[in-house]
A protein has these predicted regions:
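The feature captures the beta-strand-to-loop junction immediately N-terminal to the Walker
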Residues: 20-22
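Helix-to-loop junction immediately C-terminal to a conserved catalytic motif
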Residues: 35
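Catalytic Walker B motif of ABC-type/P-loop ATPase nucleotide-binding domains
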Residues: 144-147
Length: 260
């Protein structure tokens, strides 16, 4: 079976793709096919031109696509932050001087450089997840897949992680695939995919997808508060664009509507 995302179209390099859906819809199963944690029962999954079922290419596939999981404690293997980030490149046989540079660059990229000598258990959940992301970045992948990375975090931790991955995409040109069931985490994505029962039921910009009220209701998904407000105002007779996302865009749209 081919990946439903691959069957639709591949993420563009440097883009931010969010995959949204309820538990059991298949989004985490999809994520695990990207770097060959799971293999297709039939057909093939191609990652950067490499077939994931080819054992000789397994290391190369995982160097191209890094994975970040729900629980950062399951990815942290060392007692010092910088040693943990160095773990993957060391196993890849990267030269010591190069490892030092990669570790420093990765920790700076996620805003955790000042914590490089800390013990991971002294960090908050959001900080631990950022260290886990740094560990993936040290492998210098072309794509990072995050499988519900904020599921075990408090609101502050969630904001830290989403802000970090968004910045990596925008400033570093890294492809990001975010698996989530939080609607608000998808607002800044370039592309939003809704999955249900193992299939894609919608694929477009967040503005277009969230504006489809019938789809969201059918899938039992709650749209962002700003989108719901715009829909309610439109039903009340105001002429405005229901595709505006985010507080600032929503405020501008309402202000423009009130002038007419």
């Amino acid at each position: 079976m081919r990946s439903p995302l691959a069957a639709s179209s591949s993420p563009e390099q440097g883009s931010f793709v969010a995959v949204l859906g309820h538990n059991g819809c298949g989004k985490s199963t999809l994520a695990k096919h990207f770097n060959a944690i799971l293999l297709p029962a039939g057909g093939s999954v191609m990652v950067y031109g490499m077939e994931t079922k080819d054992e000789a290419l397994l290391l190369a596939v995982r160097q191209h696509v890094g994975m970040v999981f729900q629980n950062p404690d399951n990815q942290i293997v060392s007692n010092v932050v910088e040693e943990d980030v160095a773990f993957a490149p060391e196993n890849l046989g990267v030269a010591s001087q190069e490892i030092r540079q990669r570790v420093d660059d990765a920790l700076k990229a996620v805003g955790m450089y000042d914590y490089r000598t800390y013990a991971p258990q002294l960090l908050s959940g959001g900080q631990k997840q950022r260290v886990a992301i740094a560990g993936v970045l040290a492998m210098q992948p072309q794509c990072v897949v995050l499988d519900e990375p904020t599921a075990m975090l408090d609101p502050q931790g969630r904001r830290e992680v989403i802000s970090t991955v968004t910045r990596l995409c925008r400033e570093k040109g890294m492809t990001v695939v975010l698996i989530t069931h939080h609607m608000d985490e998808c607002v800044g994505a370039d592309r939003l995919i809704i999955m249900s029962n193992g299939s894609i039921v919608s694929d477009g910009t967040p503005e277009k997808v969230f504006a489809d009220a019938a789809l969201m209701e059918r899938e039992g998904l709650t749209v962002p508060e700003t989108t719901r407000l715009l829909h309610d105002l439109r039903k009340a007779g105001f002429e405005l664009d229901t595709e505006a996302l985010g507080v600032d865009a929503c405020a501008r749209e309402i202000a423009a509507a009130l002038k007419h």
